[in-house]
C-alpha cells in the first residue's frame, strides 16, 4: 500500500507537470494517540507510532508519504486535524457500562475544514459558531462543534452512528453479544463485520454508492430498501 500510494501521488504530480519543489508538504493524519485539533510537524516519534499503530487504516500512510516527499524537497512536513482529534467534553465519554468509555475517532480533517469554509462564507470565525457537521464517506461522522471544538461525535470507525458503505454503525448490543459467543466467528471476523464488511457491503455485496443509488432510483430491490434505511 505504501509504495503504491506514494508512486500514485508522484505520478499524478509528474502528469500535471508539478515539480518536486515545495515550501512544505502536508498530509492527512493517521490513527495516533488522542490529540486536540491543529497542525503538527511530522517527526520520528510520529512515524514510529504510525508504523506500530494499533488500528489499521490507509490514513496511517499519509504522514509517512508526506515525510518522504518533503525530504526530497528539503522542506518541512506536517499533518492537520488527524482522525484521532479528541476534544470531547467529559459527559460525552460516559456510557452505561463504566468499563467502556467512548473515544473520539472521526473525519476531523474534512469536518473542521468545511466548518471553517462555512464560517468564512457568513463572515464569521469557526471559533464563534456552534455547528452540527456531517461527513458522508466510507464511514459517517456526525459531530457537535462548539466554538471550534468537537465536544461530541460518534466513533465513525468502530461501531457508532449510522451504518455506512463499509461500517455497521450502532447495532443492538444484546444481539452483538450473542453473535460474539455463538461460536461461529472469531474476534477478527466480528471486527471486520463492524468495520470493512459491514453496512451497505454486508447487505448488498458492494460499497459503490453511485451504483447503489442508481439502482435504488430505479426502484430495484433490495437496493432501494437498504439505501432508504
PLM regions and their residue ranges:
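Gly-rich Lys/Arg/Thr-decorated short loops/hinges at beta-loop-alpha junctions or inter-strand turns
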Residues: 48-49, 93-98, 214-222
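Glycine-rich phosphate-binding loop plus the immediately following alpha-helix
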Residues: 60-68, 79, 86, 94-130, ...
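Adenine-nucleotide phosphate-binding core of ATP-dependent small-molecule kinases
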Residues: 192-229
